[in-house]
């Protein structure tokens, strides 16, 4: 999900790349495709059914009461995981502009001492976080919220789960629902839930077309598709599926991106967003990988070069890395196939930590051109295994893989070790540096601000954020291993081999040349006009933009 913070004409964007299948929402809504006119099912007194909108005879958007109940319990517990990852305050929603939060806190606040709430930190340690939260919830009964289905499917992905602890938590959740009369709260908010669903359908008109695209690409139809907005979780989305014989139900559990008019909004298909495409794809990709995992198992060492980064994103092993790589390659394929080739390339560049995503993306082109041979995605898995084998051989089992640092890496290093923000060359460089400094301080980073001329030898060996003009004498030392070289008004990309000239702004994150254990975040303008703003997406290693803010290249 991306957010823009504005200060005068200066913009600093930190794009959070979310775990477990999180992708960005679009800032603009584009009307694409047509859907069946939605029909709303209101929640009546004593009816134990979710608030739901039907987009077709197989596609539903609903507020699942089981998920709502469990997310309320997580909110009441307010653990660090909730605050840092899914708390609505992360997208500017609070009790003043989002009345639903106020209602939840006022109605359920007196019950914070109940067992279910007290168990949340323990359940997070157990692994019930991110996607596991809604997955746990849909195993509960819609009638009384007790355990209604075995945990077997959850254990396939998380074999270390303590089923006795899951049973205990389920009992505590049911007790919480009964004690608080949760159904009363749910019924009283039926109008809010239905407004949320209606706005979702309005914001995402291409949903029916997306379902058709996915079923055609993967060669398999689902019995039903259920999109579940989560009004208490922001920023993250999760995919899941359940099977009952030949019947497959595909789920997408979606956190929201903003609040407008007291209603949560998320753009999951509009404006080139692949939020929903990503989550739906997991329901086809994950089981295909599971059925053929023995083909990929010999290449598990490919996880090692990115293990630390992926574990931070809640992707703890090679199997899940495969899930995410194949799904993210599908996102790019979907964008290209639906008339957004530039966004497809941008999608790939944002996913460089999944370092063989480009290889899989190219393989999908071959798959699409030979559907007479590969009727389903499952049929293509042996070929994908050969693609991964080639990557394994070319990288010596991952030993030769180099992952360049990103804005996210710099922010994490600065959060731990502090940073010095230094500027030189012009008034515009100082103005931009002051904004970067203020942004760091708001993010809890221990930062200093000073002109480049005041940098000490000790400063140079720490994490640096440098805002410079292209005539800076520091550039010669900084650019020895940088992906982009700047010389006056000319910029050369070592990544693409392209040369650009004019009023340009370059952003780079590099290893500190004076101390390999630290990082340097650099913004260089070929003239003062180019330093009018900054886009520092978390996934970026570098970007080149002109002074009109047009993106020329990134990676």
What are these regions (language model features)?
Residues 190-248, 450-455, 459-472:
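Auxiliary, metal-adjacent structural segments of Zn-dependent hydrolase domains
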Residues 270-291:
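Active-site recognition of the HExxH zinc-binding catalytic motif
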Residues 287-315:
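Post-HEXXH active-site segment of zinc metalloproteases
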Residues 36-84, 141-145, 159, 338-555:
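Solvent-exposed alpha-helical segments and adjacent loops
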Residues 155-157, 238-270:
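Active-site scaffold of zinc-dependent metalloenzymes
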Residues 1-42:
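Secretory targeting signatures
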Residues 110-207:
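Long, mid-chain structured domain cores
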Residues 48-130, 306-367:
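Metalloprotease/metallohydrolase-associated module, dominated by Zn2+-dependent proteases
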């Amino acid at each position: 999900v991306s957010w823009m913070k504005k200060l005068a004409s200066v913009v600093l964007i930190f794009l959070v790349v979310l775990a477990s299948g999180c992708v960005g929402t679009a800032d603009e809504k584009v009307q694409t495709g047509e859907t069946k006119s939605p029909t709303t099912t209101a929640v009546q007194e004593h009816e134990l059914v979710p608030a739901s909108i039907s987009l077709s005879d197989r596609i539903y958007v609903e507020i699942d009461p089981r998920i709502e109940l469990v997310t309320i319990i997580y909110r009441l517990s307010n653990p660090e995981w909730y605050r840092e990852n899914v708390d609505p305050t992360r997208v500017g929603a609070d009790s003043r502009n989002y009345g639903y939060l106020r209602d939840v806190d006022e109605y359920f606040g007196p019950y914070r001492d109940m067992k279910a709430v007290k168990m949340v930190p323990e359940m997070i340690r157990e692994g019930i976080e991110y996607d596991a939260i809604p997955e746990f919830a849909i195993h509960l009964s819609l009638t009384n919220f007790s355990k209604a289905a075995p945990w077997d499917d959850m254990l396939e992905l998380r074999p270390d789960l303590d089923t006795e602890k899951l049973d205990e938590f389920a009992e505590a959740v049911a007790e919480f629902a009964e004690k608080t009369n949760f159904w009363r709260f749910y019924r009283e908010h039926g109008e809010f839930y239905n407004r949320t669903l209606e706005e979702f359908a309005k914001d995402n008109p291409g949903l029916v077309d997306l379902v058709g695209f996915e079923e055609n690409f993967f060669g398999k139809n689902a019995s039903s598709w259920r999109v579940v907005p989560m009004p208490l979780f922001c920023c993250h989305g999760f995919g899941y599926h359940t099977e009952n014989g030949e019947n497959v139900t595909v789920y997408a559990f979606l956190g929201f991106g903003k609040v407008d008019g007291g209603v949560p909004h998320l753009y999951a298909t509009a404006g080139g967003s692949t939020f929903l495409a990503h989550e739906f794809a997991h329901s086809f990709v994950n089981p295909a990988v599971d059925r053929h995992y023995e083909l990929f198992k010999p290449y598990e060492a490919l996880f090692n070069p990115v293990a630390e980064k992926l574990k931070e994103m809640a992707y703890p092993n090679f199997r899940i890395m495969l899930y995410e790589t194949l799904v993210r390659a599908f996102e790019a394929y979907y964008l290209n196939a639906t008339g957004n080739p530039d966004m497809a390339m941008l999608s790939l560049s944002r996913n460089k930590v999944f370092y063989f995503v480009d290889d899989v993306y190219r393989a999908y082109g071959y798959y699409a051109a030979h559907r007479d041979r590969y009727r389903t995605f499952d049929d293509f898995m042996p070929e994908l295994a050969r693609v991964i084998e080639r990557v394994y051989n070319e990288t010596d089992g991952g030993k030769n893989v180099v992952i360049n640092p990103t804005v996210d890496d710099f922010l994490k290093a600065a959060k731990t070790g502090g940073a010095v923000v230094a500027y030189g060359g012009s008034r515009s460089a100082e103005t931009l540096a002051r904004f970067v400094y203020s942004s760091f301080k708001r993010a809890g980073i221990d930062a200093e601000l000073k002109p480049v001329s005041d940098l000490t030898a000790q400063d140079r060996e720490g994490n640096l954020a440098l805002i410079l003009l292209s005539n800076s004498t520091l550039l010669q030392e900084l650019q020895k291993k940088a992906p982009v070289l700047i010389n006056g008004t000319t910029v050369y990309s070592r990544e693409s081999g392209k040369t650009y000239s004019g009023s340009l702004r370059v952003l780079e994150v590099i290893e500190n040349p004076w101390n390999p254990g630290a990082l340097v975040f650099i913004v260089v303008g070929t003239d003062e006009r180019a330093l009018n703003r900054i886009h520092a997406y978390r996934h970026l290693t570098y970007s080149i933009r002109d002074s009109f803010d047009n993106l020329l290249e990134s990676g």
